[in-house]
Regions:
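Intrinsically disordered, low-complexity regulatory segments
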Residues: 1-150, 154, 180-183
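Prokaryote-biased recognition of long, low-complexity C-terminal linker/tail segments
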Residues: 153-184
Length: 184
């Protein structure tokens, strides 16, 4: 991991590296995801046109079953007493912003966050990036754009899949990206 090398965090632990006063860890894709419909209301276990559309009033999130271990490691690291602040070094883009912020929120962390924004993983670029960290708030619009995309995809996927599955009588997966790609 290039960040760890540049920072001198070379002592490998379970799910992170530590050294030189730094902890370096990672996300494995989307560790935190939107809850399925049945979390909002048990009636959604059964698919019925009468229950559509499903439009959550307050969005709920769950830690992905496949990433619970790494989420637990991140949560524990965020709450360590010797950790004063956190650097979001997830991918530079809206999905990286979303991935980090959902983990941070789900972990219940309140520590200050800075953003590392890189277009290169070369050592010099990493050093320069760490020397020029930005306040996380400068990326709020990017995070909000990612939230909108995620929630729109969820609503289209859940509602359209259930509608067409009920009409067709067999399970069908419908989604914003899937449908145009299949139509090509």
């Amino acid at each position: 991991m290039s960040y760890a090398k540049v920072l001198g965090a070379t002592n490998r632990q379970d799910g992170y590296l530590e050294g030189n006063g730094y902890l370096v860890s990672w996300c494995i894709g989307h560790l935190v995801e939107l809850a399925p419909p049945n979390v909002y209301d048990a009636k959604y276990v059964k698919w019925s046109i009468a229950d559509l559309p499903i439009l959550p009033e307050k969005w709920q999130y769950l830690v992905s079953a496949s990433t619970q271990k790494q989420f637990g490691i991140l949560q524990k690291l965020m709450h360590r007493p010797d950790v004063e602040s956190i650097v979001n070094s997830c991918d530079s883009g809206r999905e990286g912003e979303l991935i980090f912020r959902l983990v941070y929120q789900q972990a219940g962390c309140k520590k200050p966050v800075s953003r590392l924004w890189l277009s290169s993983m070369e050592e010099n670029a990493i050093r320069e990036g760490f020397a020029n960290l930005k306040p996380s708030t400068e990326y709020d619009a990017l995070y909000n754009a990612a939230l909108c995309r995620e929630r729109a995809d969820w609503m289209v996927g859940i509602n359209a899949s259930r509608l067409f599955s009920c009409l067709y009588g067999q399970p069908l997966a419908v989604g914003r990206v899937m449908t145009p790609v299949l139509a090509m």
